[in-house]
Each structure stands twice: as structure tokens, then as C-alpha cells.
């Protein structure tokens, strides 16, 4: 048994669970893709809040880029549009692949994309063509921003929660002219990669896992507080995590004083 943590909340999860390995999302996604698709060269990852591209060579991260500024093309933007159209997000991709003639949607900005979609609705275009047009616009936006200057080669793996949208996978294939592979567990590839790394760490070190057990989290009373450290001009905001009034960890201090 072994536990790994990754993602934006990996440090907090590591403290609560007792993780054996703490890895960034780039490494975790790369490990998972290489494990399930040996020889993979390009990873397209689009989640709820951000998107990224990872270039692999010989199963090693060669280059990567992330977009954490603009929401256009992320899962949250697609959720907003599915709600506006009164279509369950689970069916969004199904509508898109039924399109016969996708309409051109401006996808460089989420605000403009939504405005353009409304305009196309008012003109009477079928909703399937509008949704597929949105998918193609988001793919162009992704390639012009996140994928700019990157050499995208096969095998290409599409992962992250947005990979559930068959319309986006189809749009990537159409625009890139490449086959897009979607893993069975596309939404948790980062977790799979962290788990693989944790298992390897335990096997190499021959040491017991640091996993605290389910009850540690389920039965404990957790609290957190923060304060500004005045020990130096950095004025770091230090966060303290406690379980039943026992300090588990501090972080946020640059000098590791706490």
C-alpha cells in the first residue's frame, strides 16, 4: 500500500493523508499517460480550471505549457454554456458529434464566445452546429495559446475532465489531423500517475507507507489558521493545520522557519 498526492491541493492532501510521494501535476499526468500509452509524445490536458500541454520524448517530459489565466476552454466555461442552453453537461459532447455543419464561433475570449453563440442562436442555427462550432473554437484557442510553438506528435493522449466531451476530441482530430486517444479514466489520470510514483517509491525504499489511514481523516477535527510572520521583510503568510488541536504542519514560509 502507498499513497501519492498531486494537483493544486497536493500539499494539504499530503499532510492529511500521510502521502509517501508529493508530485506536481505535470509529472503525474506524464507518468500516467506513459504507463497506459507507452511511447506517448503529446498530452492534452483540460480540466475544470486550467489547461496544459505536455510534450514527451522517450517517456520523459521534454516541454510543457499551462494556461491558468483565461477560463475560455476550461470545464467551468463549458458548464456555464451547458447550463445556459439547458443541456446536461454529460450530453454536451453527444450534441456536438451530431453536427452536420459546425458554425464559426469566436473562441479567443469566453465573453465573446458566449456573445457569438447567442447571436448564432438568434439567427436560427441548429444547437448541434453551435455546440460543435464552440468545440472547434475552443480547440483553436487552445492550440494558439497553450500549444503555441509546440510540436504536437502522435501518439496524442487527451485527458482531464473535459475529455468526456466527445465533441472536443473530434474537433482536435479534425484540426490536428491526428488520432486522439482518450483513456478510460481520463478524469483521474493525475491521481493514477501519483499512485504509480508512490508505489515505485515504496518498492525502491523497502519502507512502510506513511499513510495515516482512513479514520485519521474521517474521525479527526481539523482546523486551520494563518498569520503574517514578521521575522523578516518577506512578511510571509504562514498557514497552520491542526487536528484535535495538535499541529500537523505549517507552510507558506519561504525560509522554512515554521
Placement of each model-derived feature along the sequence:
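Acidic, glycine/GT-rich loop-and beta-edge segments that sit at the periphery of enzyme/chaperone cores
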Residues: 52, 200-258
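Short beta-strand-loop/turn "lid" adjacent to the catalytic site in phosphate-handling enzymes
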Residues: 1-26, 62-63
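Glycine-rich phosphate-binding loop plus the immediately following alpha-helix
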Residues: 58-101, 200, 243-244, 251-258
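Glycine-rich phosphate-binding loops at beta-strand->alpha-helix junctions
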Residues: 6-9, 137, 148-175, 186-190
Amino acid at each position: 500500500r502507498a499513497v501519492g498526492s498531486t494537483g493544486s491541493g497536493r500539499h494539504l492532501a499530503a499532510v492529511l493523508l500521510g502521502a509517501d510521494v508529493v508530485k506536481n501535476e505535470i509529472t503525474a499526468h506524464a507518468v500516467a499517460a506513459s504507463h497506459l500509452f507507452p511511447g506517448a509524445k503529446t498530452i492534452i490536458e483540460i480540466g475544470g480550471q486550467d489547461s496544459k500541454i505536455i510534450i514527451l520524448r522517450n517517456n520523459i517530459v521534454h516541454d510543457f505549457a499551462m494556461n491558468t489565466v483565461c477560463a475560455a476552454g476550461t470545464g467551468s466555461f463549458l458548464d456555464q454554456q451547458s447550463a445556459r442552453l439547458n443541456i446536461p453537461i454529460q450530453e454536451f459532447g453527444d450534441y456536438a458529434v451530431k453536427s452536420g455543419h459546425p458554425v464559426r464561433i469566436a473562441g479567443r475570449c469566453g465573453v465573446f464566445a458566449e456573445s457569438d453563440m447567442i447571436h448564432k442562436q438568434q439567427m436560427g442555427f441548429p444547437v448541434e452546429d453551435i455546440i460543435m462550432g464552440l468545440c472547434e473554437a475552443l480547440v483553436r484557442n487552445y492550440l494558439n495559446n497553450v500549444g503555441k510553438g509546440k510540436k504536437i506528435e502522435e501518439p496524442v493522449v487527451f485527458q482531464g475532465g473535459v475529455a468526456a466531451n466527445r465533441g472536443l476530441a473530434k474537433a482536435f482530430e479534425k484540426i490536428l489531423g491526428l488520432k486522439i486517444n482518450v483513456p478510460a479514466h481520463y478524469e483521474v489520470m493525475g491521481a493514477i500517475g501519483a499512485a504509480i510514483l508512490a508505489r515505485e517509491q515504496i518498492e525502491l525504499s523497502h519502507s512502510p507507507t506513511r499513510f495515516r489511514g482512513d479514520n485519521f481523516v474521517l474521525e479527526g477535527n481539523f482546523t486551520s489558521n494563518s498569520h503574517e510572520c514578521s521575522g523578516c521583510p518577506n512578511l510571509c503568510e504562514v498557514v497552520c493545520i491542526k487536528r484535535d488541536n495538535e499541529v500537523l504542519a505549517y507552510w507558506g514560509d519561504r525560509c522554512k522557519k515554521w
